[in-house]
């Protein structure tokens, strides 16, 4: 058995990136191993599963346990080179028979969250935070194994993640109303490095929860400083705060199809300059501030011609902001207006009122439109 995993790549630009496996794939493999041992007394190791797109990965077992009427198997999650907070966590499945006719029942063990709010794919109250695709994968594999041995698929499957409650504090589960641990996630079973699909999934689920709660106003911020500034104005409930970060497009495109009355986007000057330029992914590796664009904004705001070269040669957007502020020129307001136009264009007429708040590094509001 192998109970270790290689740390996620800390320098992805210097090496070919490795894909990894979702918590859902690990839970499915652990469940297959546990059920097989429950029936036969032997744990398959490694254990292979078929993923939704046909891949057949094999997983080494990090934990085995066989007792009277139950079996347990654990797999250490390898997220490849994705910066995933669950990388290295042990996903444990405990399987035991359920009363005849009950089918397959999922339960949250230690470190796996419980859903408490409406709007998520798993209905509350008290349901284990195991998403639909992992549930289906585990159900199908259990039904196939039971059919092979001529047994009814009446089982209780408890998924546990030691330390999961602490890991969950690094996620948005508490704001989504998922308490006590992490979620068991995945749609393909594969984690693609830096694809950010889990982050965008969190954004979508946050919007779903807010809509289900009847919330009319949500906030997406690029970071904690701008979030705090907006919250000082509105004091929105935690479930109204979306995990936006750099993914303005993830918020806007989902709201296009699932509208909420009002959206406030709050961010630092540089991030919202990129949104004003039309970028929807605001990460520094995927969009850059265009100094020429900033000069156009400054020129329209009244900046003198002799400032053009200084703006074009500036190292950062904040340097441009400070240059214009030093002569009493406001470019934060025009940037906010342009950012709002990008947001409205992306929403394509969806009934969402958009507000933009631009802050400086200290959280002072520079513009609000």
Curated annotation (Swiss-Prot):
<comment type="similarity">
    <text>Belongs to the CbiD family.</text>
</comment>
<keyword id="KW-0949">S-adenosyl-L-methionine</keyword>
<dbReference type="GO" id="GO:0043780">
    <property type="term" value="F:cobalt-precorrin-5B C1-methyltransferase activity"/>
</dbReference>
<protein>
    <recommendedName>
        <fullName>Cobalt-precorrin-5B C(1)-methyltransferase</fullName>
        <ecNumber>2.1.1.195</ecNumber>
    </recommendedName>
</protein>
<dbReference type="InterPro" id="IPR036074">
    <property type="entry name" value="CbiD_sf"/>
</dbReference>
<keyword id="KW-0489">Methyltransferase</keyword>
<keyword id="KW-0808">Transferase</keyword>
<comment type="pathway">
    <text>Cofactor biosynthesis; adenosylcobalamin biosynthesis; cob(II)yrinate a,c-diamide from sirohydrochlorin (anaerobic route): step 6/10.</text>
</comment>
<dbReference type="InterPro" id="IPR002748">
    <property type="entry name" value="CbiD"/>
</dbReference>
<dbReference type="Pfam" id="PF01888">
    <property type="entry name" value="CbiD"/>
</dbReference>
<keyword id="KW-0169">Cobalamin biosynthesis</keyword>
<dbReference type="GO" id="GO:0032259">
    <property type="term" value="P:methylation"/>
</dbReference>
<dbReference type="GO" id="GO:0019251">
    <property type="term" value="P:anaerobic cobalamin biosynthetic process"/>
</dbReference>
């Amino acid at each position: 058995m192998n109970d270790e995993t290689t740390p996620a790549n800390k320098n992805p630009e210097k090496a070919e990136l490795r894909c990894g496996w979702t918590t859902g794939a690990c839970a499915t493999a652990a469940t297959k191993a546990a059920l097989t041992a429950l029936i036969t007394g032997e744990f398959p190791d490694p254990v292979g599963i078929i993923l939704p797109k046909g891949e057949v990965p094999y997983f080494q077992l990090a934990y085995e346990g066989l007792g009277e009427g139950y079996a347990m198997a654990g797999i250490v999650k390898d997220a490849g080179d994705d910066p995933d907070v669950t990388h290295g966590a042990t996903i444990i499945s405990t399987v035991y028979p359920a009363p005849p006719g009950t089918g397959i029942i999922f339960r949250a063990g230690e470190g796996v969250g419980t859903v408490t709010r409406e709007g998520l794919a798993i209905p509350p109250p008290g349901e284990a935070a195991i998403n639909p695709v992992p549930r289906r994968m585990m159900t199908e594999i259990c039904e196939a194994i039971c059919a092979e041995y001529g047994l009814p698929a009446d089982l209780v499957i408890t998924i546990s993640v030691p330390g999961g409650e602490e890991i969950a504090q690094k996620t948005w589960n508490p704001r989504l109303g998922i308490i006590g641990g992490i979620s068991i996630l995945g749609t393909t079973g594969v984690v693609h490095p830096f694809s950010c699909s889990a982050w965008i999934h969190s954004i979508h689920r946050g919007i779903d929860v807010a809509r289900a709660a009847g919330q009319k106003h949500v906030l997406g911020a690029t970071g904690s400083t701008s979030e705090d500034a907006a919250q000082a104005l509105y004091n929105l409930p935690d479930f109204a705060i979306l995990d936006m970060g750099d993914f303005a497009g993830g918020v806007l495109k989902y709201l296009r199809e699932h509208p909420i009355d009002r959206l406030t986007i709050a961010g630092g000057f540089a991030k919202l300059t990129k949104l004003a330029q039309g970028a929807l992914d605001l990460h520094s590796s995927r969009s850059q501030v265009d100094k020429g664009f900033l000069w156009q904004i400054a020129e329209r705001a009244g900046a003198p011609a002799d400032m053009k070269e200084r703006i074009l040669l500036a190292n950062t957007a904040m340097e441009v902001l400070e240059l214009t502020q030093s002569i009493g020129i406001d470019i934060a307001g025009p940037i906010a207006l342009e950012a709002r136009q990008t947001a409205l264009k992306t929403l394509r007429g969806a009934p969402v009122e958009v507000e933009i708040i631009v802050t400086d590094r200290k959280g002072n509001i520079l513009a609000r439109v």
